[in-house]
């Protein structure tokens, strides 16, 4: 992830505009490849609320086993869909408080895990190579990494804040790397602590393992606090994710990327894209038939595809500008070797996703290619622009009109 984060950081210097992977690939490689990246990003957005609702339902099912999982899933979907239709937004200060609460929950989890291990197995048990080696060898670790990469996603979204940031060519690259590093440290620390307590590879309910472990190390009271904190975070995240994808669909409908009659309409009463919100809720019902690992893999397919092309866009930028004045200071090690490693790792992890994710992802890409051919009249005209950043009225900030972003 750090190799890929470095590529995002590098491209944000050369293209200090909002748009992230879509913009980088379009400008450095090709507008049609940029469209494909935007298409895969749409898959991520469509499945993100589903994954969030599914994880929340898994925690609640573990806490209340007598209540079927589908009840929690439907409750999440109906509640967030209704709130998004009326246009409820969570204030920035509330988001900050919720984020701080989740950090507190994770910090307490690690603390209780350390106390548990020392009390039951001695201080020496805190140092173990098992969390990094596992029982199934490198192949099993790689397969797990292909799913765990979901926990590192987010650094790529920093570049969408470019136009709102002071001195973006200096601060955005630093922020991208910092988010990747901090997210990585938090994930590795919590995962290490959890694996010390639960070193096995077979569990009664893998989806609620963290909550079950919280009960083991801290008792029922801490488990309730742990689940409560995570559920609040899951609920607000699901609310934001559903709002984001519905507004993304609206922007794409408004710009002619998707059928305007359905996707490009706002409610006269609430000024929200009701059809898109309901569609997202209906897609979320797929959580009734999926587990966390499989649904997360769907998101990672789109992420790994975009990551690979962003890494290649760095190499493309180097090849295009190496003989120009702008490319006089470009270092082949940082513009070829580093992104090439990132691309190879991303492709390798992509191949480690489960077959269902690969099949869905390949089908989605095939649909995107066919749709691109239709929109461009057989590649004879440029693909339409995708608006992937927020504004104050529709949730997406509009830039100058262009054939592509």
Residue ranges, per PLM feature:
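A generic transmembrane alpha-helix motif of multi-pass inner-membrane proteins
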Residues: 302-303, 333-405
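Helix-loop-helix connectors at the membrane interface of multi-pass transporters/channels
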Residues: 26, 52-73, 105, 162-169, ...
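Alpha-helical transmembrane segments of multipass membrane proteins
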Residues: 59, 81-85, 110, 191-192, ...
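Membrane-interface loop-to-helix entry segments
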Residues: 69-122, 176-181, 299-309, 334, ...
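TM-loop-TM module centered on a large, flexible mid-protein loop between adjacent transmembrane helices
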Residues: 23, 30, 62, 175-241, ...
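Helix-loop-helix junctions that connect adjacent transmembrane segments
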Residues: 68, 97-227
